Amino acid sequence: MDYLDLADRNWPLLRRVMAGHTAVYRATNGAIGHRMPFFAPTLLLDHVGAKSGKRRTSPLVYGRDGANLVLIASKGGYPKNPAWFYNLTAHPDTTVQVGSERIDVHARVATGEERERLWALMVGVYGGYEDYRKRTDREIPVVVLEPRPTG
């Protein structure tokens, strides 16, 4: 059995785990779920479905580049990008929760030298991204979340 077959079979369980993570993160205002032992730091990304228009939340590993937050749209090395990536492409202005802080952000895809620099930064946060890159033929997007003025 290859990796993708195993991941496909376990996807319903993974969705329940992610929903539980999100619920605990929100219920504790980030006290539990933001930074846990042996895990990379996690934020909650709010996004609107590109097709459905439904509001969704995804717990995602993140890194920091100055004031910006950085995400990797790896989906574990699947052949397709994660749904949240398509949703951000359609609706780039959104909100994230980092610990107890809620931040209005604008999403964009990093390219060229910036992408390579941020990829290296994120591999430092979570080394598994290199394994994911080897599993897929697609270029895994690096997403930059730039803070937006509030008000």
Residue ranges of model-derived segments:
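Extreme N-terminal tail/first-helix region
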Residues: 1-35
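Short beta-strand segments
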Residues: 40-74
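Short hydrophobic/aromatic beta-strand or adjacent loop that forms the aromatic wall/cage
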Residues: 42, 140-142
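Short strand-connecting beta-turns/loops that link adjacent beta-strands
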Residues: 65-67, 101, 150
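Short, structured beta-strand-loop surface elements
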Residues: 75-129, 135-139, 147
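Short beta-strand-to-coil "C-cap" segments at the C-terminal boundary of structured domains/repeats
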Residues: 145-151
